[in-house]
């Protein structure tokens, strides 16, 4: 089964004008869980990360997904302890044997690495696992994200830039034309054999 990174900006849940976007992102994540897609994410309480964690956890409670579909990465154990998200125990601390490799990867795509302190660099390096897996040799099949107006910004930008660099398709639900993005996601799922008909995706196309 395919793996998709579900990541994005905290701003999604910090401004009231994005309520419809929150609902859409949740529906997309829940449907992906139902379809057996494995998610990768970063345990951030706000934004697409948190929405995905909640949607997948609910799908598991509903008997429509399994815990093994959640692949979550964090910088350190403290992130797990302080997280309010369900099923936070599935999170893995970044691979200790590959910390230097993740730092090098993150620095290669970050526009202002010299301005990042140790904590920020750790968070950015964690993002590399979201895209390339625990061993950095297992890239996701795609990234579905939400950033304001589709801009590449914030902590998510490292993962997005890395995905683009590696030729991994990125679908951004923060853009105005969400129907186009949803259609592109559908095409990916058809191509990967996750679905065999557009009729398999009605919940995703309910924008309200």
Q: Can you name each region flagged by the protein language model?
A:
Residues 2-199:
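Acidic/glycine-enriched connector segments
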Residues 199-207:
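Low-complexity, Gly/Ser/Thr/Pro-rich intrinsically disordered linker/tail segments
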């Amino acid at each position: 089964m395919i793996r998709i990174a579900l990541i994005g900006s905290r701003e999604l849940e910090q401004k009231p004008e994005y309520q419809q976007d929150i609902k859409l992102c949740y529906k997309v994540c829940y449907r992906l869980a139902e379809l057996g897609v494995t998610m990768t994410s970063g345990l951030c309480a706000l934004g697409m990360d948190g929405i995905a964690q909640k949607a997948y956890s609910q799908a598991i409670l509903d008997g429509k997904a399994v815990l093994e579909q959640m692949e979550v990465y964090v910088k350190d154990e403290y992130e797990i302890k302080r997280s309010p998200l369900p099923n936070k125990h599935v999170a893995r601390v970044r691979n200790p044997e590959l910390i230097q490799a993740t730092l090098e990867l993150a620095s290669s795509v970050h526009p202002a690495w010299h301005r990042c302190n140790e904590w920020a660099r750790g968070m950015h390096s964690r993002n590399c696992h979201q895209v390339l897996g625990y061993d950095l040799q297992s890239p996701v099949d795609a990234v579905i994200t939400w950033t304001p107006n589709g801009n590449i910004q914030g902590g998510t930008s490292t993962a997005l830039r890395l995905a683009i660099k590696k030729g991994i398709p990125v679908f951004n639900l923060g853009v105005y034309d969400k129907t186009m993005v949803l259609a592109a996601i559908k095409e990916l799922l058809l191509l990967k054999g996750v679905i065999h008909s557009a009729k398999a995706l009605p919940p995703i196309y309910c924008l309200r």
